[in-house]
From Swiss-Prot:
Quaternary structure note: Part of the ribosomal stalk of the 50S ribosomal subunit. The N-terminus interacts with L11 and the large rRNA to form the base of the stalk. The C-terminus forms an elongated spine to which L12 dimers bind in a sequential fashion forming a multimeric L10(L12)X complex.
Gene: rplJ
Protein name: Large ribosomal subunit protein uL10
GO molecular function, one term: structural constituent of ribosome
Listed InterPro entries: Ribosomal_uL10 (IPR001790), Ribosomal_uL10-like_sf (IPR043141), Ribosomal_uL10_bac (IPR022973), Ribosomal_uL10_bac_type (IPR047865), Ribosomal_uL10_CS_bac (IPR002363)
Entry GO CC: cytosolic large ribosomal subunit
Organism: Shewanella oneidensis (strain ATCC 700550 / JCM 31522 / CIP 106686 / LMG 19005 / NCIMB 14063 / MR-1)
Keyword flag Membrane: no
Transferase as UniProt keyword: no
Keywords: Ribonucleoprotein, Ribosomal protein, RNA-binding, rRNA-binding
Function summary: Forms part of the ribosomal stalk, playing a central role in the interaction of the ribosome with GTP-bound translation factors.
Top-level taxon of origin: Bacteria
Amino acid sequence: MALRLEDKKAIVAEVNEAAKGALSAVAADSRGVTVGAMTGLRKKAREAGVYVRVVRNTLARRAVEGTAFECLAETFTGPTLIAFSNEHPGAAARLLKDFAKEQANFEVKGAAFEGNFIPAADIDRLAKLPTYEEALAQLMMTMKEASAGKFVRTLAALRDQKQEAA
């Protein structure tokens, strides 16, 4: 069934709004994936704060025009699933990378982050970005280790000072 012009404009506007509020985007080929698997992917995406939509290529190109994800337009060939991360930059990449491991027919085409295109082979860089909570925990660990090291150096200096006095 062909889409009416109003429907196409609504799809472009919806995807464009998602793109404007997103931190990163991932494009994938979902050809050959069962409806049940796609439903599961959409459920996981909602839980992870990821907007997922299968869009016609021409509509997807128009939707990302003028956004940081315009570099993805070259990947819009064949059936295209586009996922936008709203809460964490690596969420969509991590979600689709894990889904591709489960589904042999699912293929990630590429990603975009801060206006830069990331090829499918390098998607791990984006997927391995720590979440806000993980980054905060790493920072706290670093600060904690630094203060422990400072305490040890202070004790060593105090010991050296006492040895010199004796």
